[in-house]
């Protein structure tokens, strides 16, 4: 059944668009959006295409209550034990959203960043997505995440409170169960005025502002504005308020998220003074960064604001432009082979940008999106090239060619001759570190898989019974070697953060 489903996706892309290596970007684009349907939590919609998944986590938030919106939100507790209907009559709904990778926790920090990266793909390349027949699926993917984030804010009472996580990483990782009938704790965690999380509040503001720009939703924009104010007024890292998150998605600071959120709000509001003033007054615009990631958004903020071209050409804006250009130059200037560009990345012998042994592909796709949009910015601005140090320069065409090389590597033009996008091509990872994919579908095998019994499937050493099509695994090591083992979570686990930017990149590489 699954192979047939994948075949249908490929057939649906009626015009095959292949590059010099024979890669079909249209099919890869379709699969990348299919992946998000495989990551859905909550009650699945009638149009759900990934049929081996089923409804899951339908009681998320049900054990929580918050004060009625007519009353001031509590800033002290997240679980209401009172029975007074006037003070505690709103049951929390935290269903929906995405599982971030191969486990069953809903981590708000990477989920919000995923929504922002997906929205950026739509904002930049919506016309190309539409021409490929995938704009509707892309907007559905954005909306599924944005709707959850909106509920996480509204269910917390709105204003200065936000639910930021459902589930506990330690208890989840002690079990190997499919999401449809997991029995691990579904604890919900909140930040508020007394237990702040300015980083995650600002990131959620960025997600909703970017989604508002992609979906033209005034409701999303209102929540984004409220969350930005919350973030500015109550500074503090969210993992200090929610220690359960610290081991998995700890934050290194909040200034990048605040600048990133201000940039998206500036765009979504058409340049409202509040956000341009915040940007102009920012004392830390990041310098030259080593990467763009779920924890470090300075590069994204710099790119967004340079793309606008409407801010003053001096002060912090000029600094951001210089920093962004140096980041890009560091990536594309190499001494060949194993030579290192600056900025913390180097090229593997096979030509892959390489930062880290754990899910390196997330950095590859995010950096590639920045390069793609900047190349288009140079073209639109009629700039002949990007000037790098030592008199070197890179034309928009050269930047785009570099992006293409990274995408082609992911799709199979690499020393392993393996596609790191699951389901694409004739050879791709068979043992993905992903609970739902590795366990029998509840539809074909409804018998419960116990917490510890599931580890038999983790350790089985056989192909996944369900192909999580469109997922991009963590990828090979610095020498282009990949170990296709489900236990190899550093290389074999996919994430929504990795796939979100490639949606835009693949759309960009399609002919206009």
Swiss-Prot record:
Gene3D superfamilies: 1.50.10.10
InterPro entries for the chain: 6-hairpin_glycosidase_sf (IPR008928), 6hp_glycosidase-like_sf (IPR012341), Glyco_hydro_9 (IPR001701), Glyco_hydro_9_His_AS (IPR018221)
The protein's enzyme class: hydrolase
Residues bearing attached sugar chains per UniProt: 76, 192, 215
GO molecular function, one term: cellulase activity
Keywords: Carbohydrate metabolism, Cell wall biogenesis/degradation, Cellulose degradation, Glycoprotein, Glycosidase, Hydrolase, Polysaccharide degradation, Secreted, Signal
Main localisation: secreted
One BP term from GO: cellulose catabolic process
Catalytic activity, as annotated: Endohydrolysis of (1->4)-beta-D-glucosidic linkages in cellulose, lichenin and cereal beta-D-glucans
Signal peptide positions on this chain: 1-22
PROSITE patterns linked to this entry: GH9_1, GH9_2
GO cellular component terms given for this protein: extracellular region
Active site: residue positions: 103 (nucleophile), 433, 484, 493
Record's keyword annotation contains Hydrolase: yes
Intracellular or extracellular location(s): Secreted
Catalytic activity, EC: 3.2.1.4
Family, per entry: Belongs to the glycosyl hydrolase 9 (cellulase E) family.
Name of this chain's protein: Endoglucanase 14
Organism encoding this protein: Oryza sativa subsp. japonica
């Amino acid at each position: 059944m699954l192979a047939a489903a994948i075949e249908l996706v490929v057939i649906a892309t009626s015009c095959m668009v292949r590059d010099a290596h024979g890669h079909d970007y249209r099919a890869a684009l379709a699969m990348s959006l299919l992946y998000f349907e495989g990551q859905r939590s909550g009650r699945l919609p009638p149009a759900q295409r990934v049929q081996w998944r089923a409804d899951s986590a339908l009681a998320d938030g049900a054990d929580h209550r918050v004060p009625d919106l007519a009353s001031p939100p509590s800033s002290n507790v997240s679980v209401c034990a009172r029975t007074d209907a006037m003070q505690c009559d709103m049951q929390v709904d935290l269903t929906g959203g995405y599982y971030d990778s191969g486990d069953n926790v809903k981590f708000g920090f990477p989920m919000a960043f995923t929504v922002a990266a997906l929205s950026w793909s739509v904002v930049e390349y919506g016309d190309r997505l539409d021409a490929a027949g995938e704009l509707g699926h892309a907007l559905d993917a954005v909306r599924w995440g944005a709707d959850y984030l909106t509920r996480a804010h509204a269910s917390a009472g709105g204003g200065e409170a936000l639910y930021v996580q459902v589930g506990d990483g330690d208890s989840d990782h002690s079990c190997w169960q499919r999401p449809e009938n997991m029995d691990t704790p579904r604890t919900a965690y909140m930040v508020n005025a007394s237990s702040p999380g300015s980083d995650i509040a600002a990131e959620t503001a960025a997600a909703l502002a970017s989604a508002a720009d992609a979906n033209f939703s005034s409701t999303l924009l209102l929540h984004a504005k409220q969350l930005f104010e919350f973030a500015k007024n109550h500074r503090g890292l969210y993992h200090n308020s929610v220690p359960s998150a610290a081991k998995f998605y700890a934050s290194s600071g909040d200034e990048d998220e605040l600048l990133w959120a201000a940039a998206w709000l500036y765009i979504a509001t058409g340049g409202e003074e509040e956000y341009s003033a915040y940007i102009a007054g920012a004392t830390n615009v990041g310098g030259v960064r080593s990467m763009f990631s779920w924890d470090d958004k300075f590069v994204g903020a710099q790119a967004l604001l340079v793309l606008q071209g409407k801010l003053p050409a001096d002060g912090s804006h000029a600094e951001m432009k210089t920093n962004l250009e140096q980041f890009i130059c560091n990536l594309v200037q190499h001494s060949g082979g194993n030579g290192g560009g600056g900025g913390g990345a180097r090229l593997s012998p096979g030509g892959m940008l390489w930062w880290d042994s754990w899910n390196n592909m997330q950095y590859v796709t995010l950096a590639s999106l920045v390069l793609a949009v900047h190349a288009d910015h140079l073209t639109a601005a009629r700039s002949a090239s990007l000037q790098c140090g030592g008199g070197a320069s890179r034309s928009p065409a050269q930047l785009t060619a570099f992006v293409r090389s990274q995408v082609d590597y992911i799709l199979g033009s690499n020393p392993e001759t393996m596609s790191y996008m699951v389901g694409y091509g004739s050879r791709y990872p068979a043992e993905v570190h992903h609970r739902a994919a590795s366990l029998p579908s509840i539809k074909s095998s409804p018998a419960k898989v116990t917490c510890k019994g599931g580890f038999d499937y983790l350790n089985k050493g056989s192909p996944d019974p369900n192909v999580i099509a469109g997922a991009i695994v963590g990828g090979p090591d610095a020498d282009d070697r990949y170990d296709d083992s489900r236990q190899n979570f550093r290389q074999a686990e996919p994430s929504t953060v990795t796939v979100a930017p490639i949606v835009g990149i693949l759309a960009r590489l399609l002919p206009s």
